[in-house]
Amino acid sequence: ILTSEALQEKKIAELAEQIASKKDVKMVLIAGPSSSSKTTFAKKLGLQLRIKGLKPVTIGTDDYFVERSLTPRDENGEYDFETIDALDLDLFNDHLTRLINGETVNIPTFDFKEGTKRYDDNKKLHLNDDEILVIEGIHCLNDKLTSKIPKENKFKIYISDLTVLNIDNFNRISTTDTRLVRRIVRDYNFRGYSAKETLDRWPSVNRGER
């Protein structure tokens, strides 16, 4: 385990070196399946970026959902939160553009229970010359997410959680099932969803990851 963790840290340090060497890069986009440790990876990468003299500033795509009344629905009439069209792409691109141009932006916080964005004057953001945006989400490799941002300003990374848990010598728990358990815990703690609601949405999550 310690060897695996050391190898991972080495790879993350190499990524930070690549990012720091590209002077035009203003944001790092981290993509991966739901509950695949993107947030944990982003924190580890942020530490390595600091070693290179860059201060990471995190923005979550989850705060840029459209209002609940505008959320697309799937073939069963249920809200489809996993499609990229559930995100307010115009606002997201506007904020990113203004940030890399040196402007100050009031970042929203999405209230999942009420289905609306909320704004707090204490959440205004401005990027200094030694700061870099770190953004993570399942759609971060999709050019539609950052369509207004020049290619040279973006550095994209894909990760996937491949940890295997064994029941015994012959049977294992799939990584998909492990991610589902993580998703159930996260949704309950941070989004106010019950385990049943997460299980009902899981097929939609899988579609959004493809």
Give short role names for the model-derived ranges.
Residues 32:
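The Walker A (P-loop) glycine that initiates the GxxxxGKT/S ATP-binding motif of P-loop NTPases
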Residues 1-29, 51, 57:
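Extreme N-terminal, non-catalytic leader segments
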Residues 23, 144-210:
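Conserved NTP phosphate-binding and transfer environment spanning the P-loop NTPase/kinase superfamily
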Residues 40-41, 45, 60:
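Hydrophobic positions on the alpha1 helix immediately C-terminal to the Walker A/P-loop
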Residues 57-59, 66-115, 132:
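Conserved nucleotide-sensing/catalytic segment adjacent to the nucleotide-binding pocket
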Residues 10-18, 91, 144, 182:
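Well-ordered alpha-helical segments embedded in enzymatic catalytic cores
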Residues 93-153, 195-210:
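Glycine-rich phosphate-binding loop used to anchor ATP phosphates in small-molecule kinases
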Residues 37:
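Conserved glycine(s) of the Walker
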